[in-house]
Amino acid sequence: LVSSAHCKDGNCYDEALLDKLSNRLTGRNQFIVLHQNGSHGPAYDQRYPESMRVYNPVCNTNKLQDCSTQEVINAYDNTIRYTDYFLSKVIDWLTTRQSAYNTVMVYVSDHGESLGENNLYLHGMPYAIAPRNQKNVPFIFWASSGFYRDRDLNKECLVNLKNKEFNHDNIFHSFLGLLDIHTRHAKPERDIY
């Protein structure tokens, strides 16, 4: 199902998620989840195509402790750059469909990363002692004008939320609100929208 243009040596980049996605649209309301490789380490250099490599030199091994801190950071920053590019492709894809569908994209990472600070790498420390950079994650929202209109969302109000702190507990309840799903399990106070 994936194009070889987005794969190299058995490793597929996140863009492969968009290959043939249009063929899966049914014409009905759909909820699509794209689960990326994103910036998951330790093999950061395998998460983006060579064309996205702008920060050099990079760590080319999954043994991060064998690389300089700057090489690890450069490889990780290239993954962030590629994720930004990938999200722009998702938005482009959604934009071409907004005349037929109300489209929305929500991007959230499952965790942050340690890149060698205090000799810590990757993620997964117990929450109570995990450094902030393992707990802070991006949360990006984009929606078509039709979605804003039909859900009566106010862009200015959403922009004002950018400095508030939320956590993953908000995601489930926010999706219920966004998609106008009513259930006794919903907790409207956790819906950020």
Regions from the PLM with identified roles:
Residues 1-193:
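Catalytic domains that recognize anionic headgroups
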